[in-house]
């Protein structure tokens, strides 16, 4: 299944140490369900939970490499941790998530971007020298997620 926040925090700390030790890159995707509050208001919290479970399954399907990690970050926010993935690789995974979620075709009549549930994705790809802490990479991904939302949602922002 999908990891919780505590497990994510511990894996992320270790991956940052490993990245610095081996001088590799690390990509982190932050995802947020578009118009999720409206979804809950219309379809109810049980359907909201079901929607998040389906998204969780999509995220697990899209993280194929053994070191990749899909985690619930909080609310309707999720994180994909992709050790040693460059920006291009991270983008490929983000596009795969959006494609697989579209195929789930979860109805969302109050979305202004599509008739089904969509996500916005912020990507942070860093090298050892770029960050000091887990908070640093999360902050970058969060800023890019905010940018994806301000660009009209249902999109990916990586710089």
Describe each PLM feature range:
Residues 66:
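Hanks-type protein kinase catalytic core
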Residues 28, 109-110, 156-159:
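Short, hydrophobic secondary-structure boundary micro-motifs
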Residues 99-119:
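Catalytic core regions of nucleotide second-messenger enzymes
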Residues 1-27, 37-60, 71-75, 79-80, ...:
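Conserved long alpha-helical elements within nucleotide-processing catalytic cores of c-di-GMP signaling
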Residues 28-31, 78, 119-123:
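A structural signal for short, well-ordered beta-strand segments
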Residues 87-95, 125-159:
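Catalytic-core segments of nucleotide cyclases and related cyclic-nucleotide turnover enzymes
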């Amino acid at each position: 299944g999908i990891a919780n926040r505590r497990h994510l925090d511990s894996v992320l700390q270790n991956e940052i140490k490993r990245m610095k030790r081996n001088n590799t890159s690390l990509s982190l995707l932050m995802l947020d369900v578009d118009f999720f509050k409206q979804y809950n208001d219309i379809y109810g919290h049980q359907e909201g939970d079901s929607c998040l479970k389906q998204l969780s399954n999509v995220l697990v399907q899209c993280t194929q490499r053994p070191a990749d990690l899909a985690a619930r970050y909080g609310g309707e926010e999720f994180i994909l941790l992709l050790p040693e993935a460059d920006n291009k690789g991270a983008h490929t995974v983000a596009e795969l998530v959006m494609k697989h979620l579209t195929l789930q075709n979860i109805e969302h009549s109050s979305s202004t971007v599509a008739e089904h549930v969509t996500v916005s994705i912020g990507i942070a790809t860093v090298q050892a020298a770029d960050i000091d802490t887990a908070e640093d990479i999360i902050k970058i991904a969060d800023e890019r997620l905010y940018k994806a939302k301000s660009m009209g949602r249902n999109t990916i922002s990586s710089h």
